[in-house]
């Protein structure tokens, strides 16, 4: 059975380059309550760009 409010929810990281490319990952809400921003590789534009958390 799943908990009501999961501590480690599955989130989508969407590219800020506007390509629509996404990564799927999990995050710990207790350690990172804010929206996550990670610099990752976007294969559509073939460079590293910021990926922001989408809910």
From Swiss-Prot:
GO terms for cellular component: cytosolic large ribosomal subunit. One of its GO terms (molecular function) is structural constituent of ribosome. It comes from Clavibacter sepedonicus. NCBIfam families: PRK00595.1, rpmG_bact. Keywords: Ribonucleoprotein, Ribosomal protein. This is Large ribosomal subunit protein bL33. The lineage of its organism: Bacteria, Bacillati, Actinomycetota, Actinomycetes, Micrococcales. GO terms for biological process: translation. InterPro entries: Ribosomal_bL33, Ribosomal_bL33_CS, Ribosomal_bL33_sf, Ribosomal_zn-bd. Belongs to the bacterial ribosomal protein bL33 family.
